């Protein structure tokens, strides 16, 4: 698979087969992914790769919060959007509507919507998760937050997601996976000096589930670009 095909066929996977990904495969993907560029080659990332009993332990740590609906304990390490510009809201709502329609979740069915949110928090029962962390002292600076490690980690994440199909794997860059970072931190003994940025769900896609057939739309180039100095 060449890079054009990898980019053009990439999609978010939300249903996985139970088969774990071999460690050797994950190591090869991550080794290649670290060729991502970063500010002055700072490489401000750390991988935490989880599967098997430890991943199940993280899910169990989330259960009390889910059962008691302790939303106040859902405090990700990074600030979440408080509101969206109108255009972003439309895009977000369009995707959500598509997912719910494919999964047969009616607009007024709050119970099913809650169950879907729980599935998100539990990482859709994926066999492996790659957590991406960055150094807290590099993110928080005297004059405010330094956004560049987030940008750099984004380049790294894209590499992982584009490499995965070469091995028959699918991925989802999941914010839900890190909505309760303390649960992850406590189970895996991640120090407070490491901020948990994102969780990449990685596994073998279950293409029998129609949710994996969703291909979200993109605005045409002429709508999102301005050109100067060209004929």
Please identify what each model-predicted range represents:
Residues 1-231:
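Acidic, surface-exposed loops and disordered segments
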């Amino acid at each position: 698979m060449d890079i054009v095909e990898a980019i053009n066929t990439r999609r978010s996977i939300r249903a996985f087969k139970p088969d774990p990904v071999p460690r050797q495969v994950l190591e090869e993907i991550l080794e290649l992914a670290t060729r991502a560029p970063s500010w002055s080659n700072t490489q401000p990332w750390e991988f935490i790769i989880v599967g098997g009993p430890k991943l199940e332990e993280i899910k169990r740590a989330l259960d009390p919060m889910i059962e008691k609906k302790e939303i106040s304990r859902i405090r990700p390490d990074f600030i979440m959007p408080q509101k969206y510009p109108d255009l972003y809201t439309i895009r977000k709502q369009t995707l959500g509507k598509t997912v719910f329609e494919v999964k047969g979740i009616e607009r007024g069915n709050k119970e099913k919507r809650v169950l879907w949110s729980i599935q998100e928090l539990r990482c859709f029962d994926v066999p492996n998760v790659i957590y991406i962390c960055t150094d807290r002292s590099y993110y928080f600076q005297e004059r405010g937050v330094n956004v560049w490690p987030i940008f750099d980690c984004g380049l790294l994440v894209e590499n992982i997601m584009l490499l995965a199909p070469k091995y028959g794997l699918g991925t989802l860059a999941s914010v839900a996976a890190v909505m309760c970072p303390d649960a992850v931190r406590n189970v895996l003994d991640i120090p407070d000096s490491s901020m948990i940025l994102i969780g990449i769900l990685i596994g073998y896609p279950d293409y029998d589930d129609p949710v994996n057939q969703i291909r979200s739309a993109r605005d045409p180039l002429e709508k999102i670009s301005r050109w100067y100095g060209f004929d």
